[in-house]
């Protein structure tokens, strides 16, 4: 039977259409996915993301452990509260998961990992933590709400104490701080400003209702997916998985090659891939009528006139732009134009960098 977050009854009360999402009953939408999407781009919306897993790591070798476990380098994290995005790789360079890691103190780091990969993530982390004597604590006592949009931070501030407001004042993106019972982070999955807020499960219903009263409306998984696609953000299981290199998933920027003597899991495989070359993740735009969908083939000719084929990993109509967009994994050598096979029609598409909307504005037109 699918699990429920502490906010399940709140979703039902808000009129949500509930669906099974990787073993969790989650809201797909509350009546209109399009309206929820626009709300986040133009004002503020909130998402229940309590199905995600928060993992706390304690021990005096935690930093050393994470420098081995993760492709990005936590040595970059010198200011308490600072966070970074990274892949956690297997020995063959495939992506076990993508996650955010927060540096809270020299013997205390926090990870936030995906719900679909929870069991294998925890097994992998625990297995590799043992030699470093790092204590792994799964924070199932916490719930998580993402409040996103240009008005999100302003509306959240109305619910905070003076001390909490002062604690987060001027906090830059990719930071997190514990203030009172709230862990407030300037992270998100929409391309908008906002917060992701972790708090004790027994307090989350009251906090959700306070957000509603402050004018923050709920948004479901449908809007979350179109928002992250417009922002060019990966979804685990589509843009990357255990057989996909981060170099082929627009995650090369998250791999810290320096210093050269840092050995991390998957490094040797990635170095071979870097020498040999990999596929790449690109953006696609189709302004003609129709919708780019996952798994449709993408055809193009390289400079030498050879035809290549790739595949759409995520595709949808873009509510912000008013036409169809996609992320696609393709062989190297693609130019500015390609063709997507939709049923029996070959539809022309424009090739872009993977990212279409930032802070509510188009960045591809």
Curated annotation (Swiss-Prot):
Molecular function terms, GO-annotated: aminomethyltransferase activity; transaminase activity
GO cellular component: cytosol; glycine cleavage complex
Record-linked InterPro entries: GCS_T, GCS_T_bac, GCST_C, GCV_T_N, GcvT/YgfZ/DmdA, GcvT/YgfZ_C, TrmE/GcvT_dom1
Domain of life: Bacteria
Reactions catalysed, as given in the entry: N(6)-[(R)-S(8)-aminomethyldihydrolipoyl]-L-lysyl-[protein] + (6S)-5,6,7,8-tetrahydrofolate = N(6)-[(R)-dihydrolipoyl]-L-lysyl-[protein] + (6R)-5,10-methylene-5,6,7,8-tetrahydrofolate + NH4(+)
A Pfam family reported for this protein in Swiss-Prot or TrEMBL: GCV_T_C
Single Gene Ontology BP annotation: glycine decarboxylation via glycine cleavage system
Enzyme Commission number(s): 2.1.2.10
Enzyme class of the recorded protein, top EC level: transferase
Entry keywords, A to Z: Aminotransferase, Transferase
Protein purpose: The glycine cleavage system catalyzes the degradation of glycine.
Family label: Belongs to the GcvT family.
Subunit structure: The glycine cleavage system is composed of four proteins: P, T, L and H.
Protein name per its UniProtKB record: Aminomethyltransferase
Organism: Yersinia pseudotuberculosis serotype O:1b (strain IP 31758)
Higher taxonomy: Bacteria, Pseudomonadati, Pseudomonadota, Gammaproteobacteria, Enterobacterales
Gene name, Swiss-Prot/TrEMBL: gcvT
């Amino acid at each position: 039977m699918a699990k429920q977050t502490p906010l399940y009854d709140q979703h039902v009360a808000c009129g949500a259409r509930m669906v099974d999402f990787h073993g969790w009953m989650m809201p797909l939408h509350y009546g209109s996915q399009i309206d929820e999407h626009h709300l986040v781009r133009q004002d503020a919306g909130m998402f229940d993301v309590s199905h995600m897993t928060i993992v706390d790591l304690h021990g005096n070798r935690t930093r050393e452990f994470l420098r081995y476990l993760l492709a990005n380098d936590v040595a970059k994290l010198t200011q308490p509260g600072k966070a970074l995005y990274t892949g956690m790789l297997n020995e063959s360079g495939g992506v076990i998961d993508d996650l955010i890691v927060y540096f809270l103190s020299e013997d205390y780091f926090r990870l936030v990992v995906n719900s679909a990969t929870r069991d294998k993530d925890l097994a992998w982390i625990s297995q590799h933590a043992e030699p470093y004597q790092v204590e792994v604590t799964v924070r199932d006592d916490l719930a998580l709400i993402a409040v996103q949009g240009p008005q999100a931070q302003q509306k959240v501030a109305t619910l905070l104490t003076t001390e909490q407001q002062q604690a987060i004042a001027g906090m830059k993106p990719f930071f997190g701080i514990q203030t009172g019972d709230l862990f407030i982070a300037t992270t998100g999955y929409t391309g908008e400003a906002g917060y992701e807020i972790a708090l004790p499960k027994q307090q989350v219903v009251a906090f959700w209702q306070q957000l509603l009263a402050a004018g923050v409306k709920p948004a479901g998984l449908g809007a979350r997916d179109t928002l992250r696609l417009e922002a060019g953000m990966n979804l685990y299981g589509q843009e990357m998985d255990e057989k996909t290199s981060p170099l082929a998933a627009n995650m090369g920027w998250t791999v810290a090659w320096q210093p050269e003597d840092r050995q991390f899991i998957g490094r040797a495989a990635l170095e071979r891939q870097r020498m040999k070359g990999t596929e790449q993740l690109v953006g696609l735009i189709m302004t003609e009528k129709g919708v780019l969908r996952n798994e449709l083939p993408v055809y193009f000719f390289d400079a030498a006139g050879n035809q290549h084929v790739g595949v759409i990993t995520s595709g949808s109509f873009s509510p912000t732009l008013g036409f169809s967009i996609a992320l696609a994994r393709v062989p190297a050598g693609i130019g500015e134009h390609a063709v997507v096979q939709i049923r029996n029609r070959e539809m022309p598409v424009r090739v872009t960098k993977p990212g279409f909307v930032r802070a509510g504005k188009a960045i591809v037109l």
